Amino acid sequence: MAMTSTMQLLVLSFLVIASLFLGATVAPPASLISTPDQALKDKADLIVAKDGSGNFTTVNEAVAAAPENGVKPFVIYIKEGLYKEVIRIGKKKTNLTLVGDGRDLTVLSGDLNGVDGIKTFDSATLAVDESGFMAQDLCIRNTAGPEKRQAVALRISTDMTIIYRCRIDAYQDTLYAYSGRQFYRDCYITGTVDFIFGRAAAVFQYCQIEARKPGIGQTNILTAQSREEDTATSGFSFQKCNISASSDLTPIKGTVKTFLGRPWRAFSRVVFMESFIDDVIDRAGWTP
């Protein structure tokens, strides 16, 4: 039952992306996203728990134990807790699913950053290079802070990815949608400078996108998409999302410039549709 719902989500992601980027006319029902949460946890292949009640106490141990080149979804259930780890999911760990107890309860946390000499690509708290990845009910964050510049929370560098009901928190360069087809549903994403960036074909539905208080002299920019060729079928699409200011930015939002995006490359493509956009966004919309 849980595996069927996971595959339904994969199908839905392809339908939506095909509709928005490849010209197909598709209107999939929202009921496709109906994961039976407890069933998914009950059928987990491995359990991670800080208190020792699972198979492992760290996420990295569970990822290492997952099979390589799997053709069926392999589920790792991560129980409530704070996991201070830098997690790397390699190309051979295909069809891996990470599911937590909630985006405010199961937290994956790191603090790698550019000021300390880490390249942006390598700074992610969670980096995924395998296809067929899914994350649900997790918080993924980078706590480096605005003064540390580039500090990625989540990097996705592969195809067929679904991020569902997750919180993705950082400041500059929060979410690196590096490549491939990616689908984000019911997520909460926060940041400051270029905090959703990359060259992926990414769809965001029913997501909360929240600009935070940036570092001194910085301008908030929600997106920096890097489509490099006019024939490339990539871009970012935001549908039925809510764009607003965080609690620390709200009192000063009149003094901080916040834009929907900037063209990172010549053929950058970003669309906001059927979404609420708060007055935190500059009237110009996009960077000059």
UniProtKB/Swiss-Prot annotation:
Substrate binds at T120, Q150, R262, W264. Keywords: Aspartyl esterase, Cell wall, Cell wall biogenesis/degradation, Glycoprotein, Hydrolase, Secreted, Signal. This is Probable pectinesterase 56. Its EC number is 3.1.1.11. It catalyses: [(1->4)-alpha-D-galacturonosyl methyl ester](n) + n H2O = [(1->4)-alpha-D-galacturonosyl](n) + n methanol + n H(+). The record marks Q172 as: Transition state stabilizer. The gene is PME56. The active site is at D173 (proton donor), D194 (nucleophile). GO terms for biological process: cell wall modification; pectin catabolic process.
